[in-house]
Amino acid sequence: MAFQQGEAAPVSTQSSLSFTQGFLLGQLSVVLLIGAFIKFFIFGEAPPPPSRGLRASTHRRSNSIFSQDAPPPRSLREKPSTSNVLRPVPSSATNTRSILRKTYYSAIPPNPSSKHRIHHSSHQPESLDWFNVLIAQTIAQYRQTAYLLKDSPTSSILHSLTAALNNPEKKPSFIDKITVTDISLGEEFPIFSNCRIIAVDDPMSDGGRLQALLDVDMSDDNLSIAVETSLVLNYPKPCSAILPVALSISVVRFSGTLCISLVPASTPPLHTPSPMPSPPTAGAQPAAGAQPTDGGDIPPKSSSKSNIAFSFLPDYRLDLSVRSLIGSRSRLQDVPKVAQLVEARVHAWFEERVVEPRVQVVGLPDLWPRMGRTGVRTGDESETGSNTASRPAMSVDMSSPGHLQGDGGNHEEELRFRGLGPRPPLPFDAVSRTSSYQVETGAPRSPSLTRERSLGDDFHMPGSMPEAPGAQ
């Protein structure tokens, strides 16, 4: 018995020491973990955020050549002068080499300093499948609009063509009135492909000018026009003889290379030789730096706008099918000489307008978001009502005279076309709109869209005391 009691004493002492050591070691580890957390997670410096552009793109931008000579950043306390608020644009902002380098497009020739620059691009050509879809939708919309306006006395394509063909300033006196008998706008669409960007020499811009080349092909389409007229013999007396003529012109195939380039607003308009120069005025000659006063030389708008210039290369292909019928009783059908004359005239008309070196310059539309051009998709009435309820302060009075006359006299027609102006009652159910707003369908919207019930009428805080019946 004594021997067993002697063995139990060392075992209890050893277990108490092991418990104390484990307890102290656990407390020390907890203190170290808390200290490391405070040091590295609370007082540690945050790592710089990674650049999303460098992670998403395989290319890495090199430092700009202007980074070494760039001025030091200004302090926020330094107030800029009121006459120069906009920061200056670098001189190389429109340089072709800078634009292509920043967009990762390899279009600069190997030896750009040579006199004759090589017009080619080492970049892979684009297929333009998405562009073909957009162009097809646009052409289809134009065809549908032309058909819907066929009965309009002034806006139809028939009226426009008749007025253009019977222009007294261009039509010869031996041709009687031209009547359009058939018009076909076609059913197919042009196919664009093999788009490439090249750099061409331009003395008006620094480093040349960028130009897009697109191969276009349109074939097997029913694009035609048929007219009837008469050849009048006015000698020895007026209308001494009349020869009826009927023509039908169809486009069999058209293919070529379309050139598109942007003309900045500061660049003067491209010099396009005119086949009919305007006669000089009888007054004194203007000064060297004076502006011309002729209304045909000055654009109607004084605001400078960027323009887009497009043309076709001279190696285009335009195949026409001309059918003719001459005479009243004994008729001559499909005379080869008549077909040659008509084809030569059509080719001359086309080359005088859109074949290099002549280009067509069109002003780019204003893409700045304006409330007058804001529309709502017809299939999102319910979603639009909920979004408008959350933004009642952004409502605009569309029926006020000042708003309709802000951008021009025909602004009301544009709003009606876009579905924003006064319009007749719509066939869809408008209960969802009238239940939230006091707006009558078919009438102009009120200056403020007043809700029938305020949002605070049915709002209750969870756990709040009920209000007294007489409380306001």
UniProtKB/Swiss-Prot annotation:
Keywords: Endoplasmic reticulum, Lipid transport, Lipid-binding, Membrane, Transmembrane, Transmembrane helix, Transport. Residues 270-280 have a biased composition (Pro residues). It is a single-pass type I membrane protein. Residues 1-22 are lumenal. Residues 51-92, 270-303, 370-472 are annotated as: Disordered. One of its GO terms (cellular component) is endoplasmic reticulum membrane. Residues 44-472 are cytoplasmic. One of its GO terms (biological process) is mitochondrial genome maintenance. Residues 281-297 have a biased composition (Low complexity). Its main location: endoplasmic reticulum. The chain crosses the membrane at residues 23-43. CDD domains: SMP_Mmm1 (cd21671). Residues 450-460 have a biased composition (Basic and acidic residues). It comes from the Eukaryota. It is found in: Endoplasmic reticulum membrane. Residues 124-365 form the SMP-LTD domain. Residues 81-92 have a biased composition (Polar residues). Component of the ERMES/MDM complex, which serves as a molecular tether to connect the endoplasmic reticulum (ER) and mitochondria. Components of this complex are involved in the control of mitochondrial shape and protein biogenesis, and function in nonvesicular lipid trafficking between the ER and mitochondria. The mdm12-mmm1 subcomplex functions in the major beta-barrel assembly pathway that is responsible for biogenesis of all outer membrane beta-barrel proteins, and acts in a late step after the SAM complex. The SMP-LTD domain is a barrel-like domain that can bind various types of glycerophospholipids in its interior and mediate their transfer between two adjacent bilayers. Belongs to the MMM1 family. This is Maintenance of mitochondrial morphology protein 1. The gene is mmm1.
